Amino acid sequence: MIYGSQGAKIEIDDRLLAHLQLVIMTKLRRNEQFLFAWDHDEAYARGHTALWINPSIPLHFQYVGSRRPALNRAWTEALMDAANSAGGLRVVPEPAEH
């Protein structure tokens, strides 16, 4: 994912990115702004990052693989629930499909 006019590149696994793209684009189509936050992988660095997602901020979804991953509806719903909460969108573990 590439965020903002400075082109900050954020490495996100293709499967997670596909789910995040659906949630983020749904909210942006509704002209909603929200916080997107995640904890860093310990192999990368300790800590966390938070981004303000707003329709006026450039956002580009870039995938490594050539195929779009299949979507897990339960995961999409869990991510959307998080995005609609006061704490904003946070990466949650993928649940089993119903």
Provide a role label for each language-model segment.
Residues 1-13:
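Short, extreme N-terminal segment that most often corresponds to the first beta-strand
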Residues 2, 46, 50, 74-77:
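Alpha-helix boundary/capping detector
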Residues 12, 19-22:
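N-terminal intrinsically disordered, cationic/polar leader segments
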Residues 13, 50-54, 72:
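Helix N-cap / beta->alpha transition motif
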Residues 22-30:
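Short, intrinsically disordered, mixed-charge
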Residues 30-40, 89-98:
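Short glycine-rich, low-complexity/disordered patches
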Residues 32-64:
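Short, structured protein-protein interaction patches enriched in aromatics and acidic/basic residues
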Residues 66-98:
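Mixed-charge, glycine-accented linear interaction segment located at domain edges/termini
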